């Protein structure tokens, strides 16, 4: 199961974990993925996996059931 937004196709980003001594080790920044129920224009409902930011936008536009 890929950690990717179904609508915007955004995925995890890479970066560095920094200790107090500023040693750098690689890490991954994952998305805050949520499963939401979206109502399509024809009235059918679909469950999709989107980031929290996308879910907030869909809710504001009135697509979330």
UniProtKB/Swiss-Prot annotation:
It comes from the Bacteria. It comes from Mycoplasma mobile (strain ATCC 43663 / 163K / NCTC 11711) (Mesomycoplasma mobile). GO terms for cellular component: ribonucleoprotein complex; ribosome. Residues 17-26 have a biased composition (Basic residues). GO terms for molecular function: structural constituent of ribosome. One of its GO terms (biological process) is translation. This is Large ribosomal subunit protein bL28. NCBIfam families: L28 (TIGR00009). InterPro entries: Bacterial_rp_bL28, Ribosomal_bL28, Ribosomal_bL28/bL31-like_sf, Ribosomal_bL28_bact-type, Ribosomal_bL28_sf. Residues 1-26 are annotated as: Disordered. Keywords: Ribonucleoprotein, Ribosomal protein. Pfam families: Ribosomal_L28. The keyword tRNA-binding does not apply. The keyword DNA-binding does not apply. Belongs to the bacterial ribosomal protein bL28 family.
């Amino acid at each position: 199961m890929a950690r990717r937004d179904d609508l915007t196709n955004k995925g995890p980003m890479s970066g560095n974990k920094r200790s107090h001594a500023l040693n750098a080790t690689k890490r991954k920044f994952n998305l805050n993925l949520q499963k939401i129920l979206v109502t399509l224009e024809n009235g059918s409902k679909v469950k999709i996996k989107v980031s929290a930011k996308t879910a907030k936008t869909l809710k504001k536009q009135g697509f979330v059931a």
